[in-house]
From Swiss-Prot:
UniProt xrefs under PROSITE patterns: RIBOSOMAL_S6
Source species taxonomy: Bacteria, Bacillati, Cyanobacteriota, Cyanophyceae, Synechococcales
Disulphide-bonded residues: none
GO biological process: translation
Protein name: Small ribosomal subunit protein bS6
Region (Disordered) residue spans: 99-121
Organism for this UniProt entry: Synechococcus sp. (strain CC9311)
Length: 121
């Protein structure tokens, strides 16, 4: 059996929807992918950000990133659901070369390095 390709779907929700509704959209799209046979690997809320240009008269949007793998049939299913939703103002799915790397730790929050790495004086 060959390895299924990896995909990353980024979508932007309207900025005026409440937080509970944002969570329901995130859950809805995860469930759609799972029911279609894809494996959801990661889901990241990027938060409300300013758009580079207005989309549907909105200057901000709530960004959500969804990483998944499957045979490719699931991409059409989730994009159709997003196209029919009035709360999704933009979406894009790209095929990845491999799984996403582990999340990076923000500077200043990682544990201090071990002293064994220091050169002797």
């Amino acid at each position: 059996m060959t390895q299924q390709p990896y995909y990353e779907t980024m979508y932007i929700l309207r900025p005026d929807i409440p937080e509970e509704e944002v969570e329901s959209h995130v859950t809805k799209y995860r469930d759609i992918l799972t029911e279609a046979g894809a494996e959801v690997l990661d889901n990241q809320m990027r938060g409300k950000r300013r758009l580079a240009y207005p989309i549907a008269k909105h200057k901000e949007g709530i960004y959500v990133q969804l990483s998944h793998n499957g045979d490719g049939q699931q991409v059409g299913v989730i994009e159709k659901a997003m196209r029919l939703s009035e709360d999704v103002i933009r979406y894009l799915t790209v095929k990845q070369e491999g799984p996403l790397p582990a999340p990076r730790v923000a500077p200043g929050t990682e544990a201090p390095a071990e002293p064994e790495a220091a050169a002797p004086a």
